[in-house]
Amino acid sequence: EGYREYIKNQITELLTNYGKIYTLFWDIPPKIDDPLLNELARRLQPGILINDRGWDKGDFSTPEREYRATEGERFTRMTEACNSLGRQSWGYRENEDFYSYRHLVSSIDRIMAMGGSYLLNAGPNAEGEITEDYAGRIRRIF
């Protein structure tokens, strides 16, 4: 109960002290089951888009890593597919086992062809920097 109250206070602060907020991307443990959190967000920021990792279906889907689909299939709702440059971590990891350039480009192409957007994650190191091994891969893709 204390953690739920903490989340409510944080959401209230974020959605009232920083102007117009367009998107709320939940990424928290599902054991916090409180549909009122999405209601609070929508009350504080009318028109906000909320992902599907909260307590209702949200406004858009967020599949992670590998998304299997039939050739020619299209998403039936707004979708932002997520992946990371590396196979082992969503953040920075020294000696990361990176996905191949070909794999990432193919994933991006597939999601975009289905009508979705693609979030490619690259985490900073302990000094807050995106290291060259990560940055170089991003430059090569984009």
Outline where the language-model segments fall.
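Mature catalytic domains of secreted/periplasmic carbohydrate-active enzymes
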Residues: 1-142
